[in-house]
Amino acid sequence: MELKLLNSNGQEGAVVNASDVVFGRDYNEALIHQVVVAYQANARQGNRAQKDREQVKHTTKKPWRQKGTGRARAGMSSSPLWRGGGRIFPNSPDENFSHKVNKKMHRAGLCSIFSQLAREGRLSVVEDIVLEAPKTKLLADKFKAMGLDSVLVITDTVDENLYLASRNLPHVAVVEPRYADPLSLIYFKKVLVTKAAVAQIEELLS
């Protein structure tokens, strides 16, 4: 698989030969969907809480006697049938939302995403991205010259200047290959990978 190599002005020059195992896979929408949903589910935390009839603060006194009133029998006002009573199946902060995806499926899903990005022209390779200082304007001007506004940068090692400069740009993220997640790969309009990172991605996913 040949990937486009961009220069500092965003113009296409030479090409980089990449592994077909990682960058030349068929598009598998069902697998990609499963991997993305699992990633989102595993990022969820239990922050919902409701009370059952035991936790609701109510008296345990019987509202009225069992027989003779003509009304429906009732044991206590915390009953789920009553207004202000507890929930029958309350949401709990201990709820587990995680989805399990096998390692082979996860790797195959990432390969399918990388391959589709390459086919759509959303994946490009750069020699390296070097900044002289941790200035947001320097990085913003560099991406503007390359015609990029929403970009995920994957580098072999995250340079401190590059990382600090990218933090204040709303649609820019800088990660190492091992931290490239399926949701970010799909979310950003463009994915820039350094030449050294291409080899790392192939090693991780082959």
From Swiss-Prot:
GO MF terms, alphabetically ordered: rRNA binding; structural constituent of ribosome
Record keywords, A-Z: Ribonucleoprotein, Ribosomal protein, RNA-binding, rRNA-binding
InterPro entries: Ribosomal_uL4 (IPR002136), Ribosomal_uL4-like (IPR013005), Ribosomal_uL4_dom_sf (IPR023574)
Segments of this protein annotated with the region Disordered: 45-85
Subunit structure: Part of the 50S ribosomal subunit.
UniProt source species: Burkholderia mallei (strain ATCC 23344)
Protein name, per record: Large ribosomal subunit protein uL4
SUPFAM superfamilies linked to this entry: Ribosomal protein L4
Keyword Zinc: no
Record's GO cellular component terms: ribonucleoprotein complex; ribosome
HAMAP family attached to this UniProt entry: Ribosomal_uL4_B (MF_01328_B)
Biased composition range(s): Basic residues: 58-70
GO biological process entries: translation
Similarity-based family: Belongs to the universal ribosomal protein uL4 family.
Protein's job: One of the primary rRNA binding proteins, this protein initially binds near the 5'-end of the 23S rRNA. It is important during the early stages of 50S assembly. It makes multiple contacts with different domains of the 23S rRNA in the assembled 50S subunit and ribosome. Forms part of the polypeptide exit tunnel.
